[in-house]
Design a protein with these regions (language model features):
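Phosphate-binding loop of NTP-binding sites
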Residues: 1-121, 125-138
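Adenine nucleotide phosphate-binding catalytic loops in nucleotide-utilizing enzymes
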Residues: 94-101, 136-224
Length: 224
């Protein structure tokens, strides 16, 4: 909230969800940095927001936000927001599943009116939020894994597609730090957020392949 009250001039990209936040945050930071953008990333991951360097209007703040942090924030107005997924978590704090979902939804409601909302839709709770945001006229990029969708990004068999029937935009197979269905979702969300922040696929795709990953996340332990 104190960070929000400084009214940062740089773009703010906020990422939440039950799982995948840290990987998506660090991946988006890597993509933007590789493209030459000035970036500060942190909040729930690594660097506290009050330790961020000041960035000018050409820079980007990338925030990983837990439901706890969203609860304590009233004035944040991100220009790009991602909700990866929702599954039962922190129910003791939020008084049950409804309270937890409300906390996640609040970040989308706080976002700038013209913000791009990158929304996973692979669980029933996220899918409902995606439908609600579309019905409210918000700018939604839907993310789906393992199935075709007509509007948004989907990943099927490791191939990233922009719409049903289209040619693949990117091949995620063979990226050691982004292996598995869960990381395909993270990669698709980071791709969509980077595009919303003005990058092109030509800038994004090579950065996906050079992403170093996070410690203890799908690291190669040994080779035979």
């Amino acid at each position: 909230e104190l960070f929000a009250r400084t009214r940062p001039v740089a773009a703010v990209a906020a990422i939440t969800g039950t799982n995948g936040k840290s990987t998506t945050t660090s991946l988006l930071r890597h993509i933007l940095t590789t493209a030459g953008r000035a970036v500060q990333a942190g909040a729930n991951l690594g660097l506290p927001v009050l330790d961020f360097d000041n960035l000018d209007a050409a820079g980007t703040y990338v925030l990983e936000l837990s439901s706890y942090q969203i609860d304590l924030t009233m004035g944040l107005r991100p220009q790009v927001v991602a909700l990866l997924n929702i599954s039962p978590d922190h129910l003791d704090r939020h008084g049950g599943m409804d309270g937890y979902i409300t906390a996640k939804r609040r970040l989308l409601q706080m976002a700038d009116a013209k913000a791009v909302l990158v929304l996973g839709s692979d669980d029933e709770w996220s899918a409902r939020i995606c439908q609600d945001m579309r019905a409210a006229g918000r700018r939604v990029v839907e993310i789906a894994i393992g199935r075709e969708i007509n509007d948004g990004l989907s990943v099927r068999d490791g191939q990233l597609y922009r719409a049903a029937g289209a040619r693949p935009v990117a091949d995620l197979n063979g990226i050691e730090t982004l292996r598995g269905v869960h990381d395909w979702q993270n990669a698709a969300v980071a791709f969509a957020m980077a595009e919303a922040l003005g990058l092109t696929p030509v800038q994004i795709i090579p950065a996906l392949r050079t992403y170093p990953g996070l410690p203890h996340r799908m690291e190669v332990a040994a080779r035979q």
